[in-house]
């Protein structure tokens, strides 16, 4: 993802063609990675937050459940959690990026471990 504020990005499962999110946001610096989704009341349908580089996240102080996938640099899902509750930690030894999605999105898109995710400009 570039830093172009005009560009729109979506997250697609390469195996199924399903769009996991059509409003993709990145947390690539230290401050934005620390903040993540903290302070939000919910996560909108179609939204996703990519946190990179990281191989661990927490949901401390969060007010809602989320789906989380950890991917390799190549975009392969190495670990995932559905409906991760607040006040939890989640890590993936081989993870490079964490992608946080609204709870239920992984099941709705038939996304499984080993799938490759890709970012598309549209």
How would you name each of these model-derived features?
Residues 1-122:
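Compact, glycine-rich, soluble single-domain proteins
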């Amino acid at each position: 993802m570039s830093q172009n504020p005009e560009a729109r990005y979506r997250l697609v499962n390469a195996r199924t063609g399903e769009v996991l999110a059509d409003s993709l946001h990145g947390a690539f610096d230290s401050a934005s990675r620390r903040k993540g989704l903290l302070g939000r009341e919910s996560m909108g349908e179609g939204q996703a937050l990519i946190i990179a580089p990281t191989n661990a996240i927490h949901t401390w102080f969060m007010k809602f459940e989320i789906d989380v996938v950890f991917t390799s640099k190549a975009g392969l899902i190495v670990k995932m959690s559905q409906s991760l509750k607040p006040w939890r930690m989640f890590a993936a030894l081989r993870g490079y990026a964490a992608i946080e999605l609204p709870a239920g999105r992984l099941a709705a898109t038939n996304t499984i471990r080993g799938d490759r995710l890709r970012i598309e400009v549209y």
